């Protein structure tokens, strides 16, 4: 890599020029063009472009411990809590397991998930942009955002699914 300051030919990946010690950081990192590439796709592509896997669906009275076990078995980071009418009333996440369920102590087997879940999470629509999901995750410090599908079902956009979407695209 040529140093833009002195012209010295440095090894690829060097942080500083061996000759003049100027920073070479970020010189070989591709930049996103605000009018194309990853930025445009994240801003314009809707959430239907993300990998959509079925999620764990539970009822408010289900045992929080049982829900956590279902999440572990299915390798999911959250469970959506739906009432009998199929309305989203909560989300129960790995964070809830670590912070709330564990602190429930000996009575953990008796705690219903609706006492520990995050109530009334706002679900995005499939037609919302990937950027909308990223914004919700960043602002709320969430790793999972519910998505309401047109057919009435729910799926989850996770930070992992967003990163996979970005990584798989041919920019």
Model-derived features: positions:
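Tandem CBS (Cystathionine beta-synthase) repeat/Bateman regulatory domains
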Residues: 1-171
């Amino acid at each position: 890599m040529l140093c833009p300051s002195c012209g010295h030919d440095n090894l690829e990946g060097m942080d500083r020029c061996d000759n003049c010690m100027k920073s070479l950081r970020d010189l070989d990192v591709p930049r996103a063009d605000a009018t194309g590439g990853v930025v445009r796709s994240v801003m314009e592509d809707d959430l239907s472009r993300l990998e959509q896997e079925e999620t764990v669906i539970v009822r408010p009275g289900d045992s929080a411990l049982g829900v956590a076990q279902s999440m572990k078995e299915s390798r999911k980071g959250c469970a959506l809590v739906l009432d009998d009418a199929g309305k989203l009333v909560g989300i129960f996440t790995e964070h809830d397991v670590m912070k709330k369920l564990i602190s429930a102590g000996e009575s953990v087997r008796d705690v219903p998930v609706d006492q520990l879940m995050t109530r009334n999470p706002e679900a995005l629509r499939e037609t919302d942009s990937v950027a909308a999901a990223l914004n919700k995750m960043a602002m709320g410090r969430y790793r999972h955002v519910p998505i309401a599908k047109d057919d009435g079902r729910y799926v989850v956009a996770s930070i992992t699914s967003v990163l996979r979407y970005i990584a798989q695209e041919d920019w």
